[in-house]
Amino acid sequence: ECTSIMSDVNWSTTRAYGLGINGLYLNLRGRERDGIVEHGAERENLLNELVTRLTAVKDVDGQSVIRGVYRADKIYAGDATALAPDLIIGYRRGYRASWQTCLGNLTPEVLLDNDSVWSADHCADALEVPGLLCCNQIIRADNPSLIDLAPSILEDFGLQKPQAMTGRSIFTA
């Protein structure tokens, strides 16, 4: 038997909800079973409000907790975008969603110290985490990007990149 982690949520008044480590979803009419947020102006206003309020969150020392909040419809493309959270939270280095939050629970505190031995994860804003790619081939592309990895791997295995996939091979100029 399965128990819903959000069984106590009053969906008739919930405009947005978090699921996972850094995704926020709007309770959209037509997409969610009990959606209340209308597409159009109401959706846009709520997205803007959430971005503004989240980027204003500070810790007890007055430091910003969130570097950026990104709209899926602005950073993703393709058919799978509909499956993505409406907003992706990019935490500053040293901050993340709590373990309880990731599981759909609420804690009395807004911010908690991480007293776990786990000290690294993928909640951080991509601009906070430098990347490094080690490979045994010459990278011929100028200014390669993360979105270029999947097409590069496919090419290396002799497979065609799907038409809807963004990015390009880093191994060809």
Question: Which role fits each region the language model picked out?
Answer:
Residues 141, 162-163:
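Short, surface-exposed helix-loop/turn micro-motifs enriched in polar/charged residues
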Residues 163-173:
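Cytosolic regulatory/linker segments at or just downstream of nucleotide-handling modules
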Residues 26, 71, 135, 172-173:
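Generic structural "secondary-structure junction" signal
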Residues 102, 133, 137, 170:
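Adenosyl-5′-phosphate
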Residues 6-38, 113-157:
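Substrate-binding rim/cap in mid-to-C-terminal beta-strand-loop elements of soluble/periplasmic
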Residues 56, 155-162:
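Short, well-ordered loop/turn and helix-capping segments at boundaries between secondary-structure elements
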Residues 1-104, 152:
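Secreted, luminal/periplasmic, and some membrane-associated catalytic domains
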Residues 100-118:
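Short, surface-exposed loop/helix-turn segments at secondary-structure junctions
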